[in-house]
């Protein structure tokens, strides 16, 4: 497979590796971006395991809670400007209200909102506002107590990041603190048990390869892996993360002190995982001039 400059740039952007190292990683792994990242980490050439997904889409995430049921909905637009539009915000709020009774994203799009489906309401809004829009995704959660939080709010209940936290016991103030923590730190799962076993095994293998590069005895390597995986879990699982409100405690320990059990969470961020293709404007103009 031919390794292009764009592929090298993407790998450099996601790992902080040098140009020649990035090119070699792609060559060694036949252009497989994910395998190239692991190769760089194994060789100690990646500055950090940065997330390769680039956020590009605009819009708003809205959260709604009714009793022990909460929903979060992402509605995308082409520009950030539309997210500040009162008509767009009103539509997003209406969609979130409807989402409280929807089972999934398809049911939400087909649900009634003011005499028309949500999907048709969005199509009509496109004609009025003049930008392409879409109801991209929704997530829901149930629990004894459900608390919501919006980061970078554009209007009540909607902003760039929406979080829902479900707890048994504890008070609303603690739930709000946990929701703010989740917005800031973005844990991958509630606990180790909730992580994809394949992801855990892959991380363990990467750490094993890194440790073996040191040339240390196998018994020492095994102890190194235990320590490194413990550190990994403290970084990606909510209950094991250092609590932003009190860094001396893990979130799990803070929950015990608050008399609460955290049973789940939802975190949606606008544009998460969507990549937009950036056109080279100068090249486009040059091409047009040449005919």
Curated annotation (Swiss-Prot):
InterPro entries per UniProt: EF-Ts_dimer_sf (IPR036402), Transl_elong_EFTs/EF1B (IPR001816), Transl_elong_EFTs/EF1B_dimer (IPR014039), Transl_elong_Ts_CS (IPR018101), UBA-like_sf (IPR009060)
UniProt family annotation: Belongs to the EF-Ts family.
PANTHER family noted in UniProt: ELONGATION FACTOR TS (PTHR11741), ELONGATION FACTOR TS, MITOCHONDRIAL (PTHR11741:SF0)
Keyword annotations from UniProtKB, A to Z: Cytoplasm, Elongation factor, Protein biosynthesis
A GO term, aspect molecular function: translation elongation factor activity
Protein name, UniProt field: Elongation factor Ts
GO CC terms in record: cytoplasm
Gene: tsf
Function recorded in the entry: Associates with the EF-Tu.GDP complex and induces the exchange of GDP to GTP. It remains bound to the aminoacyl-tRNA.EF-Tu.GTP complex up to the GTP hydrolysis stage on the ribosome.
Region Involved in Mg(2+) ion dislocation from EF-Tu: start-end pairs: 79-82
Compartment(s) of residence: Cytoplasm
